[in-house]
Every structure is written in C-alpha cells, then in structure tokens.
C-alpha cells in the first residue's frame, strides 16, 4: 500500500506514532496532510527530510543519507540541506517534476519556551507547496519562456476540452476551448510544466499520450475538485463579482477549468495568490496548429535534443530583455492565422525597419529595463525585495526616455499602431517618486538585513538609524548635560553587564546630587552609581534600535508595495509595451542583419517564395564565411503538390523545412529569409520528416511513421501545409511505394491542400501524368566521371538515382565495400526494371493502387458483425489502424 492510499490509523501504525518524540509526531502530522509531497521540515539552519522522503531526496540531490535517532529500535532515515541553499536543491527536485512542501518554523525557540515551557516544540506549518507549474523564483524557472500551469476539463460529450493555463510568474491567465482531436496539439503549443486532470482520466489514452509526449507533471485531482458549483463560487469570490458573466461568456467546462486552477493555486500558495486578471478568452483557431512532431522536426523553439542551440528561436532571438524574449517565444509557438492581425504586426516591423536609427537607440535603452512582470508578481505574493522596487523605478525612468525619443523625432510620421505601443511609456510620476524617495539604492535582497528605507523618508527611521550609527555621541551629550546640572566635572556614564548604562560619581561628590531624578543604583568603595529614566530610555532605544528599525522598515515597505500593487494594471500594460518594442525592434534588426524581406499574404492557396533560405542553416554558414544556396518554391491552386526526387545529402530535407519555417516566421509578423514571399495564410502545418525507433513506447520506425501520417491526413484542411519526407521508407520497397502513392492521391483528391513531398521512390514521378496539381522537382547535380557535385538547387524535373553509394563513399566506407555494393546494385536494377514498369502500368491504368478488380465476397460472420458496429466518422486514425490489424487476424 502506498502512503497516499493510507488512512490516518494505518499511517500512524506504520511510523509508531504513539511512541515517537513530540517533534517527530509534529512531523508525522504535517506529513500526513501532504502525502503527495516531499516534505522539507525546518530544523534550525536546515531543512530536513525523513523516512521515504529522505531516501528519495538523497538520491536525487546527491547528498548523504544519515539518521535521526530511532523509533521503536528502528533507525529514522534523514537527510538535510542548509536553509540558505534551498533554491539550489529545489531546482533539482522541480526539474524531476516532484511536488515539494516547505514547512517553516513559525516562532523562535525562545518564543516557544515562553509559550509552553522548556519542553515546548517550536510551532511549524507548511507555508508553501512548490510544484513545477507554480514556481516564481528567478533561479528556478527560465527567463526565456513561460512557465504554465494548466487545467484540462472535458465537456460532457467528450468532444471538446476546456483548457485554462496560467503563468504564475507573470500573472497571465487564459482560457481556450479545443476540439478533442486537437488537445495534444494545443498542449504542444503551451508546453506546460504541470497539468491538472481529473482522476477519471488517469487510465485514459489522453493521460498516456501526455506522459509519453511531454516532459511535465500530471497532478490528478478527485472529480469533485472540478465540480461546477464549487468552481463557480471560487471564481466569484476570487474576482469579487456577483455574476459569472462578469468574466465573459464562458461554458460550464471553462468555469470548471478556471475554478480548479484558482483552487489549486490557493492550496499551493496558502491563499497568497497574486492579483490575476480576468482570464483572457482565446479562440483556438486564431493560432496556427502545429503538432508535437512538427514542432520537434522543424526545431522551432528547441532542437531535436530539447536544447536552444540550433533552433529557429535561437537564430531569431536578438531581443535585449527577458520579457521580450518570452514574447518572441510566444510568437513562434503561436503563429497567427488572421490576415488583418498578421499585417498589423508586419506594418509595425516595417515601421521600425524603415527607422533603424531609432531602433539602435531603443535597443540600447531597453537593456536598462527589468523584467517588471515577474517583479510585480513577487511583490503581490510578498516574496519581493527592495531590488524589485528599484527595478520598477529604473524601468519607469528608461521608458520615459524612450518615449522622449519618439517625441524628439519630429520627422517620424507615427502611425496609430505605433502610438498605441508607446503611449504607456510616458510613465507614472507618482509611482516613480514614491520609490525614488523611499528605497535606498543599495537596498539588500533580504528585508531582515535592514537598510532598505531611506532615512529621510520617515522621521522615526532617521531617528533609529541615528541611534544605531551615533549611539556613543548621544551618551556623551547626556553626560555633558548632567555635568552642567550637577556641577560635577568628573561625572561619567559607564556600562557593565549587571547595571547596563549608569552614572558614576566619586564618593566625595555625592552631596552634589540633589535632584530626585537621579536614582541610586549602587555604592562601591570609591564611587556611587545612579541612573535616570532618561538614561534608561536611551539605553532601551540603543539596545532595541536595530530590531525596531527593521520592524518599522518592514511596515513601510509593505505599505509601499501596497501602493505599487494599486498600479499593477498600468505596470502590466507598460511591460507589454516594452516587450512588444523589444520584439519588433528585434524583427527590424534581423531583417537588416540577414537581408530579410516583408512577406505578402492572401486568402487563396498562393505559396510563392523567391530565393528562400533556411534561417538556421544560413546563420550557421555565415559564421564560417560560407553562403547558403537559395531556392524558389511555387505552389498554387493549380499546382498544389511539389514532388521532389533526388540524391541523398543534396538538401531535400533542408528545402522542406525552410519553406515551413518561412511560413511560420511570416505569420508571426516578421520579415522572412527570401527575396520575396507571397503566402496564402496557412491554418495548420504538418511535418513528417525522419523517424527514430521508439522502442520504449513499443513503436517501430514504420509504425511511428504511419501513425504520424495518419494523424496528418485526418487533421489537415484545404488551407494546411503538409511537409512529407520519405513516407513509406520504413517497410519493403513495394509496400512503401504503394503507401506513398496512395497518400499522394489522398492529398491531391481529398484534402486539396499544399504539400511538399520528398521521396526516393522515383516510380512516383509518373503520377504527374494523371494528378494535374502535382509537379515534379529534383535536385541539380553535376557529374564528372565518377565524381558528383551536389548543387543544392531545386529544379523542375525528375531523378532516377539516389546516389546512395556516393554518399556512402563520402562517409568513409571501405573501397571494397563500395565496389561490391555497386555490383549488387547493378543486378538489382536489372531485375527491378520490368517489375517497376508493371507497378507503374497498373497504377496508371487504375488511377489508384487500391482500385483493384473486386473479388467475390467471402462471408465472415465475425468480420461482418465488426463492420456493423463501426461509425467511420467517429473513429480516430489510431483506432482505424488498430482495426485493420484486428480484421487481418479475422480474415
């Protein structure tokens, strides 16, 4: 039995609760309330873990596993980490998708003794639960991408999912409805770190697919966690509204998704949730659909290995701010599909491209701004420091300077859309002055260190700091005052551990002390000692000044933060403006740096790319002083399919990828790597390029290839762009040719969308004779005797060779192996010529490889019954493939 399934009695029995120490009983009580977490239990200067948590954490963190005494003769496993190094160790645990509960001491040992005697246990409780989707600390999350927590709720008919996603670090929250067939595609776009699901979905295909495809934590909740009435009340209470319509027209499942995510934040943050805005309602169709495989194959935001290097994002990202980098990440993850919105972005890019002088100045100034989105979240969640406030101050100051650039540049004719971006840059003088007058420039990270508030901001702060810095002077002043009052020039003020501060006079001067304010404390052989209420008060102030000033500074800091939070709406708008400026100036910069051009968009199936280049490959070649070989791509309603044959290693795959990437870059509002580009808006891009055996998932190369191809054919529309490379290569030649042929027919006749199709099956080139919207292209080469030069140019025509032996020779295979392979190839070519002609003849005569002459129907009662239960409109591609295998067994 796992811990999570234990009731309280079973749990206490397991750990011998009744005979445990009081401290260990306290630990067990808190652990039982957080069975799904690793519990970090504060013990003085360490956070300690016990029992199973300790064993697991010691392995993950690479720290020593020790023990803390015994319980019923059984040693208690224990490991610990220093409290000041907590974030370092949390990073490792969160990276492994663990959920961590932080249990802190809520009082000092001295306070505990006052409360309950010397045996009292310090009060402790969980102050926060940290999960992959609820992190806000800078050291624990990437500054370059969002950190989404997602709640997914299926509608009653299971045809749609409502997905609410929030980036707690920036206080951004969204809600979207997604068709059941598009759920994984939407999750691929979001790349969530943590997903909330109902326990009812625990054994579903959806949960299984999420675990296989995405590196995230799934947190299951009981079904009642998503109950409509409960979730609606949570929303009303959180946003302080009376009617659910106050957050917009949303469905029941959307209410459940939003309410459940707010409840989860409340549980993990212990009610300390930032002021989240009302969720922004997203139209799923407003973004281009790009599935998980395509994102991976095209290496849009990461490379195949999951790293940034070699990705499109890495090549395009010359932003100078963290929030600008995140916005570019969002743009690339979510290309637009609305022409008006795309053109609006392109016009902004064009404006800055036409004014590169101001772009250079803006980019330099933006380097002085801070990530105020995340600063503001830390402030609202009481996890900020004075440096967060200073960051806001410097950003306000810089924004005003940037705004001045536009005002000074009278020659600039500012379009309305630029005016909207720069309007928030005028700043907020009241907020700036508040921070400027109150927060010291050298403010520490830790409020407990003091020294955060300027002395002149508050008279009491000035007074207490004066005591701290000038305590001896105040004692000297009082001594001089008492000398004048008594006429005793030898009067001193001294200190010892028994009396503290005291007035010390010689015995012969005792008759001069006439004022009753001097209170006798002690008589020694040579002197008499006194005190006064004035001296006692000064001593108390000196002793407590440090504590008092830190306490006062915290109060003042909290009040300043409250006033900053009141300006949170403006600060978020300012952050959006600055990040937008950064991204569009970045687009202008790369357009100038790499000679990109403004694309043109249409509502038809146009796809005219002149002298297009692959941005990542080109950037890599430029570093070695080499140039990229550009290529054209022409697709249209009349010529929708480009069938490419040609040798290995000649650039087919690069050509396929570059045209898909150019489309994505264009639809995010950037100029593109081409001489010109005219594109009919693409609603979905699918890419089937290469495959590796996925033995862990039990899928061969061919099965993975067929599943991906099946999904592409099922989900594509007329406005989609399909990129296919070597379909059918994972099986026998004739099976492969047959599948590739049929797939091409389906795309041509049924989908009628644009498609780039690369293949080694030269037999497919004859399809141009009876598929009018298909055109043959090949890779240009130069042959000189046995030598071959790949020119990397895509030209009209066909190729009847793959030049595999030439590539093998380049790879360094032994000459004897190459020569023997050439002999074998010659024999195979002679054998296959006649067979190839037969295949082509059959295909040409029938127009489809699968329109064979029908055979007499052989009755199979089981097969008949199976067919009767199938609704072809409701089964998924994967289910269809499984049925084929099942029918094959029946036959």
Curated annotation (Swiss-Prot):
Biological process, per Gene Ontology: mismatch repair
Keyword Transmembrane helix included in the entry's annotation: no
GO molecular function, one term: mismatched DNA binding
A Pfam family that the UniProt record links to this protein: MutS_III
Domain of life from the UniProt record: Bacteria
InterPro entries: DNA_mismatch_repair_MutS (IPR005748), DNA_mismatch_repair_MutS-lik_N (IPR007695), DNA_mismatch_repair_MutS/MSH (IPR017261), DNA_mismatch_repair_MutS_C (IPR000432), DNA_mismatch_repair_MutS_clamp (IPR007861), DNA_mismatch_repair_MutS_core (IPR007696), DNA_mismatch_repair_MutS_N (IPR016151), DNA_mismatch_repair_MutS_sf (IPR036187)
PANTHER family (UniProt xref): DNA MISMATCH REPAIR PROTEIN MSH1, MITOCHONDRIAL (PTHR11361:SF34), DNA MISMATCH REPAIR PROTEIN MUTS FAMILY MEMBER (PTHR11361)
NCBIfam families assigned: mutS1, PRK05399.1
Similarity comment: family membership: Belongs to the DNA mismatch repair MutS family.
Role description: This protein is involved in the repair of mismatches in DNA. It is possible that it carries out the mismatch recognition step. This protein has a weak ATPase activity.
Protein name in UniProt: DNA mismatch repair protein MutS
Organism of provenance: Rickettsia typhi (strain ATCC VR-144 / Wilmington)
Gene designation per UniProt: mutS
């Amino acid at each position: 039995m796992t811990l999570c399934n234990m009731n309280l009695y079973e749990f206490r029995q397991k750990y011998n609760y009744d005979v445990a120490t009081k401290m260990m009983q306290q630990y067990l009580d808190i652990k039982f309330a957080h069975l799904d977490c690793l519990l970090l239990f504060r013990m003085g200067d360490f956070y300690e873990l016990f029992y199973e948590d300790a064993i697991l954490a010691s392995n993950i963190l690479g720290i020593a596993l020790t023990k803390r005494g015994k319980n019923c003769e059984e040693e208690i496993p224990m490991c610990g980490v220093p409290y000041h190094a907590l974030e370092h160790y949390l990073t490792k645990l969160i990276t492994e998708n663990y959920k961590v509960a932080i249990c802190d001491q809520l009082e000092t040992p001295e306070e505990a003794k006052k409360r309950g005697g010397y045996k009292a246990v310090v009060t402790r409780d969980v102050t926060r639960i940290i999960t992959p989707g609820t992190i806000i600390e800078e050291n624990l999350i990437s500054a370059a991408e969002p950190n989404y927590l997602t709640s997914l709720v299926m509608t009653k008919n299971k045809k749609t999912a409502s997905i609410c996603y929030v980036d707690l670090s920036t206080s951004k929250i969204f809600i979207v409805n997604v068709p059941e067939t598009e759920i994984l595609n939407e999750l691929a776009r979001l790349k969530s770190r943590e997903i909330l699901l109902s326990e009812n979905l625990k054994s579903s295909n959806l949960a299984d697919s999420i675990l296989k495809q995405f590196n995230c934590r799934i947190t299951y909740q009981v079904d009642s966690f998503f109950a409509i009435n409960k979730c609606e009340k949570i929303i009303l209470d959180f946003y302080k509204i009376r009617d659910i319509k106050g957050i917009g027209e949303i469905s029941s499942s959307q209410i459940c998704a939003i309410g459940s995510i707010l409840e989860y934040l409340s549980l993990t943050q212990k009610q300390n949730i930032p002021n989240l805005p009302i969720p922004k309602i997203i139209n799923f169709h407003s973004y281009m659909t790009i599935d998980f495989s395509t994102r991976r194959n095209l290496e849009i935001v990461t490379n195949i290995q999951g790293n940034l290097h070699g990705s499109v994002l890495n090549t395009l990202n010359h932003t100078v701010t963290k929030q600008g980098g995140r916005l570019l990440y969002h743009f690339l993850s979510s290309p637009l599909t609305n022409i008006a919105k795309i053109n609006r972005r392109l016009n902004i890019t064009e404006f800055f491209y036409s004014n590169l002088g101001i772009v250079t100045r803006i980019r330099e100034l933006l380097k002085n701004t801070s990530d105020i989105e995340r600063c503001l979240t830390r402030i609202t969640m009481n996890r900020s420091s004075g440096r967060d406030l200073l960051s806001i101050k410097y950003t306000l100051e810089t924004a005003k300077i940037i705004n001045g650039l536009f005002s000074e540049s009278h020659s600039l004719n500012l379009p309305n859309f630029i005016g909207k971006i720069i309007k928030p840059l005028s700043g907020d003088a009241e907020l700036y002055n508040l921070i400027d007058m109150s927060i010291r420039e050298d403010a520490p990270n830790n409020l407990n260190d003091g020294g955060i508030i300027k002395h002149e901001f508050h008279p009491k702060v000035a007074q207490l700091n004066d005591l701290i810095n000038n305590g001896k002077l105040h004692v000297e002043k009082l001594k001089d005052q008492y000398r004048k009052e008594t006429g005793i020039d030898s009067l001193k003020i001294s200190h010892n551990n028994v009396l503290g501060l005291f007035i010390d006079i010689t015995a012969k001067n005792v008759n001069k002390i006439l004022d009753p304010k001097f209170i006798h404390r002690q008589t020694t052989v040579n002197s008499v000692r006194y005190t006064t209420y004035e001296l006692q008060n000064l001593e108390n102030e000196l002793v407590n000044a440090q504590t008092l000033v830190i306490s006062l500074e915290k109060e003042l800091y909290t009040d300043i933060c409250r006033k900053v939070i009141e300006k949170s709406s403006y600060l978020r708008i300012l952050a959006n403006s600055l990040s937008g400026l950064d991204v569009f100036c970045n687009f202008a910069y790369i357009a100038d740096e790499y000679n990109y051009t403004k694309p043109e968009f249409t509502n038809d199936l146009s796809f005219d790319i002149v002298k297009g280049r692959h941005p990542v490959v080109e950037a890599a070649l430029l570093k070695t002083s080499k140039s990229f070989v550009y290529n054209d791509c022409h697709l249209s309603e009349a010529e929708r399919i480009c069938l490419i044959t040609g040798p290995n290693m000649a650039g087919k795959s690069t050509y396929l990828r570059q045209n898909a990437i150019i489309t994505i870059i264009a639809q995010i509002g950037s100029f593109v790597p081409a001489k010109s580009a005219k594109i009919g808006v693409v609603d979905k891009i699918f890419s089937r390029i290469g495959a590796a055996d996925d033995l862990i998932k039990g899928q061969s190369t061919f099965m993975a290839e067929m599943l991906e191809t099946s999904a592409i054919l099922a989900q594509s529309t007329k406005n989609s762009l399909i990129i296919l490379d070597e379909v059918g290569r994972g099986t026998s030649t004739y099976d492969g040719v047959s599948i590739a042929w049929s797939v091409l027919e389906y795309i041509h006749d049924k989908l009628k969308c644009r498609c780039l199709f690369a293949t080694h099956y030269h037999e497919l080139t004859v399809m141009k004779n009876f598929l009018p919207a298909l055109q043959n292209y090949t890779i240009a080469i130069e042959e000189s005797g046995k030598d071959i030069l790949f020119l990397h140019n895509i030209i009209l025509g066909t190729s009847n060779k793959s030049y595999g032996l030439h590539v093998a020779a380049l790879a360094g295979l032994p000459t004897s192996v190459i020569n023997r392979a050439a002999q074998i190839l010659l024999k195979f070519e002679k054998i296959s010529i006649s067979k190839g002609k037969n295949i082509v003849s059959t295909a040409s005569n029938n127009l489809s490889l699968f329109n064979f002459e029908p055979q007499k129907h052989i009755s199979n009662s089981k097969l008949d019954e199976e067919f009767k239960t199938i609704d072809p409109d409701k089964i998924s591609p994967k289910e269809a493939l499984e049925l084929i295998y099942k029918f094959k067994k029946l036959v």
